[in-house]
């Protein structure tokens, strides 16, 4: 099974969000709006992306 690589960009601010959502952003390596990281599509990462999907733009590489 191959693991997909995803490009994740934070498009909205984390100000005023739940602490658990801020923790998910930190876990993904995102710090501020318009910051982009490339992550592997493991089940753990996909769960974090799902939880804060309203703050992100996700592209498959």
Curated annotation (Swiss-Prot):
Cellular component GO terms held in the UniProt record: cytosolic large ribosomal subunit
Alphabetized NCBIfam families for the sequence: rpmD_bact
TM annotation in the entry: none
CDD domains: Ribosomal_L30 (cd01658)
GO annotation terms (biological process): translation
PANTHER family tied to this protein: LARGE RIBOSOMAL SUBUNIT PROTEIN UL30M (PTHR15892:SF2), MITOCHONDRIAL RIBOSOMAL PROTEIN L30 (PTHR15892)
Molecular functions per Gene Ontology: structural constituent of ribosome
Family affiliation: Belongs to the universal ribosomal protein uL30 family.
Pfam families in the cross-refs: Ribosomal_L30
Name the record gives this protein: Large ribosomal subunit protein uL30
Record's subunit section: Part of the 50S ribosomal subunit.
Gene3D superfamilies from the UniProt entry: Ribosomal protein L30, ferredoxin-like fold domain
UniProt keyword terms in alphabetical order: Ribonucleoprotein, Ribosomal protein
């Amino acid at each position: 099974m191959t693991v997909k690589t995803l490009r994740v960009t934070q498009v909205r601010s984390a100000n005023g969000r739940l602490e658990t959502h801020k923790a998910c952003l930190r876990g993904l390596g995102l710090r501020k709006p318009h910051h982009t990281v490339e992550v592997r599509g493991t089940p753990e990462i996909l769960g974090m992306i799902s939880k804060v999907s309203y703050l992100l733009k996700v592209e498959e590489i």
